[in-house]
Amino acid sequence: MDRETRALADSHFRGLGVDVPGVGQAPGRVAFVSEPGAFSYADFVRGFLLPNLPCVFSSAFTQGWGSRRRWVTPAGRPDFDHLLRTYGDVVVPVANCGVQEYNSNPKEHMTLRDYITYWKEYIQAGYSSPRGCLYLKDWHLCRDFPVEDVFTLPVYFSSDWLNEFWDALDVDDYRFVYAGPAGSWSPFHADIFRSFSWSVNVCGRKKWLLFPPGQEEALRDRHGNLPYDVTSPALCDTHLHPRNQLAGPPLEITQEAGEMVFVPSGWHHQVHNLDDTISINHNWVNGFNLANMWRFLQQELCAVQEEVSEWRDSMPDWHHHCQVIMRSCSGINFEEFYHFLKVIAEKRLLVLREAAAEDGAGLGFEQAAFDVGRITEVLASLVAHPDFQRVDTSAFSPQPKELLQQLREAVDAAAAP
C-alpha cells in the first residue's frame, strides 16, 4: 500500500468508524479486469475493496499457476490420473448436493481415489447416479501439502488476516479446493465471518448469482428463513415469500476456466458448476472488512442470546454459556476475536516500530499504519461492549485496554508529519 492509497482508505473509514454502509442494488454488470500489468493494488482498493463490489480477473492473472499446468488435461478437463497419483489416498470432505440439511448439504469423508471413481462413473452414466450428485468441498489441500506448487497468491489478496492468524496458530486455514461434476452446486449463503473471498477455476466453468448486502432480507420466507435455492419456483409463492417482489435481480457471472472472482464482504451468493470443475477458494479478512466481521459477531451473539433467553435468570453464568454456544455455532466468540485482533495488531506494531517504509502491497509502513487504524476502531468497540466486559480477561496479555492504548499511540505517531 502506498501513501496515497492509505490516505484514501483512512478518509473513507474516518466518517464510518465501525459502521458498515449498505451497497443497495447490484450494479448492472460485473467489472472485468483483463491485464495484470495495467491493474495495481491501488486500483483494486479504489475500485472494489472500498466500495465493496465484485469483479472478475481474466485467466492471464493465473496462467503461471502449478495447478493449472498439472491438474488439467490438454483438453481442459480435470486430469484424474495426475490427481490420483499425487493425492489418491488423501481423505477429503464430500457433500451430497441432492440432500438439504438445514440450508446446506450433509458431508461424508472418503479418499480422493474413491471420489474420482464415483466422478468417472457419474460422467459415464450421463451425469447421473443413485448416490446423487456428490461435490468435494472445503478440502484444506494447502494446509496438508504446504510445499506444493499449487498457486501464487495474487497481490490484491495479500493482506489476509484470517490465514495470517490461523497460520500463526498452526492449526487450520481458510484455503480450500472444490471439485465436482457439472451440475454440482453450493446453496445460497454468505461467506464465513462476512469475509471476502476469491475463487479461481483451475478448470471448468461456474455460474454465480450474487446479491449485495441487505438484498437477502427480501428473500426471507414468512418465518424469517433465507432460501436454500434462489432459483426455486417456491420463491414466487407470495404467501410463503411475501417480500420476494422487492428483491432486485442478482448479479450473474459466468466464470470461465482460469478466471478469478472476487466476492465482496456480506454478498450472499449461490454457485453452480456448468462443467466438470476444480476451483481454489480463499476466505480472508483485513482492515477493509473488519467492521463487517465485528458486526456479524455481534449479530450472532444476539441470535444465541435470544434463542436461550428463557434460561437467562435460572442458568448460572448464562453469559458465559452464550459465548460457548456462539463459538460452537459460528467458529469464534468474543474472546477469540480479541486474540485474533491482538495477533494482527502486535505484528503491525512491530512493523511501525521498525519504520519499514516501502511501496506496493506488501506489509510495509503504510499498510501497517492503515491496519492499526482499523484495529483501533474495532477494538475500542469490542472493549466497550457489555458482553465483552463480562469475559474473564485476567489472563490476557496484554490486557485489552493496554493494547488499545498502544494502538492509539501508534495511530497518533503514524499520523505525525
Swiss-Prot record:
GO molecular function per UniProt: 2-oxoglutarate-dependent dioxygenase activity; metal ion binding; peptidyl-lysine 4-dioxygenase activity; sequence-specific DNA binding
Pfam families per UniProt: JmjC
Catalytic activity: L-lysyl-[protein] + 2-oxoglutarate + O2 = 4-hydroxy-L-lysyl-[protein] + succinate + CO2
Matching InterPro entries: JmjC_dom, JMJD6_ArgDemeth/LysHydrox
Metal-binding keyword on record: yes
GO CC terms, sorted: cytoplasm; cytosol; nucleus
Obligatory cofactor(s): Fe(2+)
Superkingdom as given in the UniProt entry: Eukaryota
GO biological process, one term: positive regulation of translational termination
Keywords tagged on the record: Cytoplasm, Dioxygenase, Iron, Metal-binding, Oxidoreductase
Domain JmjC stretches: 142-301
Residues that hold Fe cation according to the record: 189, 191, 269
EC number(s) stated in the UniProt entry for this protein: 1.14.11.-
Subcellular location: Cytoplasm
Task of the protein: Catalyzes the 2-oxoglutarate and iron-dependent C4-lysyl hydroxylation of ETF1 at 'Lys-63' thereby promoting the translational termination efficiency of ETF1.
Similarity field: Belongs to the JMJD6 family.
Subunit structure, interactors included: Interacts with ETF1. Interacts with the ETF1-GSPT1 complex.
Protein name: 2-oxoglutarate and iron-dependent oxygenase JMJD4
Species name: Homo sapiens
Gene that produces this protein: JMJD4
